[in-house]
Amino acid sequence: NSHSVRSSPTLRGKALRELFLCQKVPDPPPNVDFSALEEAGDVPTARERLQVHNSNPSCAGCHLITDPMGLSLEKFDGAGRFRETENGVELDISGELDGIFYDDVHGLTAAMRDHPKLSACLVNRLYAYGTGGPVELRYDRDALARFTTRFAEQGHKLPELLRDLALSEAFTRVRPPEAPEESVVNAAKPPQSQVASTAR
């Protein structure tokens, strides 16, 4: 979740939101102007470069929920190498997650761990992976609720969740295919007039 030559706090924060909290982050507007960010000149750190987002109302809404998380991972550059500085400037990796402020990546980890959406999202992700997904709430809602409750009761222990999933009916039964809609069936049949003319 980085660009080809540099890290991307925005992409990293977006990945954390979507993969671990199951919160969809909207794509940027089609007319967004990236030039202000790309032409940041001699601004030394990503934190300073990304300040441009806060001045644009069409960008600020989403970047406020991605950038603070991603900036906490800035001690890993675009290739994943550990670093203490960027362009000679010591990195500030403090951040915020939904009102929880922290000083470093360990604080981010704790904030993610305690987030109210993490548990249900992990259950959803593992259930979808284990059953071949995607999750369909009209069929899977009750099962997901049960697994989420059990996961909490067991102290959020991942091995126990995996065991429950593997022993569930979702792994031992196959959902029958749905009957095709009437319009689809009729569309597959040739008109009676065509059948009659073919038979002559």
Predicted regions and their residues:
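Sequence context surrounding c-type heme c attachment/ligation sites in exported
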Residues: 1-105, 109-113, 117-119, 138, ...
